Regions:
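Aromatic-anchored helix/helix-loop segment that forms the rim or "lid"
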Residues: 236-245, 289-320
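Mid-to-C-terminal alpha-helical segments outside catalytic/metal-binding sites
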Residues: 2-21, 31-105, 135-143, 164-168, ...
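Short aromatic-enriched loop/helix-cap "lid" or pocket-rim segments at secondary-structure transitions
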Residues: 32-36, 120-121, 218-221, 275-279, ...
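Hydrophobic faces of well-ordered beta-strands that scaffold small-molecule active sites
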Residues: 21-24, 106-108, 150-152, 176-180, ...
Length: 374
């Protein structure tokens, strides 16, 4: 993990030894809150949100106990030249991210849209919000620089409407994935089948990412042992969501039912995947009659169909342990990500520096190119 608090020149920041890299986890924000996305909504909904006084953005849904240690989730050196919030100006992000680090393509998602996809404003409103965010992102990011590709957000709470949204936006060349916010419905539930069917039909991977609303209100995933007390607990707890979600996808038969569909786990961590695969494989062998739809060990499905975003890269005390972890997990499962413009982001030249060149090629470039539309 590289925590960045002050600005640097491009010359001061090392670049990867693999040429141009792909960044699989970048976030955009809307500069003027809901006013930014209202023009992309039907008139009825514009008036509805205006009458309600609906607001989006910020961390108003997060209790003060979870305040960020820097006072903001955003990098202090990534504010725009006009003083705007980081992640609100595509032209500035082009220079600050794409050019600065030699990024060949970046996958964008909106945590603000993700919260709406979880039903933050209600089921019908969530559908309208997600669609508006997607159109906003295409116009204000992809059309500024086509290296910015969109993980189109869909309402997890309304799977049929989500499937319609996928089919609506998928033909656009700026759309690279389907961003599916987590809810308290397990990912392996047939509730999501319309979404998975549409994504597979359109050749788009399912992009999974936290929204920061988890653990905070009914409808989002809950922490298994009760309420969390502080930011540190909360940040670590996100790594617990990934294993449960992955096990659900595997043992429910979802990957077997949708054989051409890939899933991306962004910012859930990945070190846990190694012992989880061991546990899933042994469970499959001992309890195989209960999951007859699995014709191969779970680890096979993981390595063939699952990708993990690398941010945040945790720093083991013994540097060689990271290389061992990558070897056990398989470099073919990892995709580099910066988490720009967040405070704890990683940069290309400072992570996986001792990995073999073949692994770097996979992590920084080839894996992303194989499943995203760049």
């Amino acid at each position: 993990m590289t925590t960045i608090a002050t600005g640097h020149t491009a010359e001061e920041l090392p670049r990867p030894e693999v040429g141009a890299a792909y960044d699989t986890d970048v976030h955009f924000y809307v500069a003027d809150g809901i006013d930014s996305v209202l023009p992309y909504m039907p008139l009825h909904w514009r008036r509805t949100f205006e009458m309600r006084g609906t607001t989006i953005g910020g961390d108003t849904h997060v209790p003060p106990r979870f305040d960020f240690p820097t006072g903001s989730r955003l990098r202090l050196d990534a504010f725009t030249p006009s003083g705007g919030l980081p992640g609100t100006d595509a032209a500035f992000a082009k220079d600050d991210l794409l050019e600065r680090y030699d990024i060949a393509g970046a996958v964008l998602s909106s945590l603000e849209a993700g919260q709406q996809g979880q039903g933050f404003s209600g089921t019908e409103a969530s559908t309208v919000m997600c669609s508006a965010f997607n159109d906003y992102a295409i116009e204000h990011w992809y059309e500024v620089d086509n290296r910015f590709r969109i993980a189109a957000c869909v309402p997890s709470v309304a799977p049929d409407a989500a499937a319609e949204e996928i089919r609506r936006v998928a033909p656009h060349p700026g759309v690279a994935a389907v961003y599916l916010p987590l809810t308290n419905v397990p990912l392996g539930s047939r509730h999501y089948d319309p979404i998975y069917e549409a994504a597979q039909e359109q050749g788009l991977p399912i992009f999974l990412h936290i929204t920061a609303a988890e653990f905070n209100y009914q409808g989002t995933p809950a922490y298994p042992t009760g309420w969390l007390e502080n930011f540190s607990e909360r940040r670590v707890a996100y790594t617990l969501l990934g294993p449960v979600a992955l096990a659900s996808l595997i043992f429910s038969g979802t990957l077997a039912r949708f054989p051409r569909l890939n899933f991306v786990f962004a910012e859930f961590g990945y070190a846990w995947a190694v012992p989880l695969m061991w546990r899933m494989d042994s469970t499959w062998r001992y309890a195989r009659p209960g999951t007859p739809w699995l014709t191969m060990p779970p680890s096979h499905y993981v390595r063939e169909r699952i990708k993990f975003g690398t941010q945040p890269v945790d720093d083991p005390e013994v540097p060689g342990h990271m290389d061992q972890l990558v070897e056990m997990l398989g470099a073919e499962t990892l995709m580099f990500s910066t988490d720009y413009p967040h405070w704890d982001g990683d940069t290309p030249g400072r992570v996986f520096t001792t990995a073999p060149q073949g692994s770097k090629d996979l992590i920084f470039r080839n894996n992303a190119a194989s499943i995203f539309r760049f």
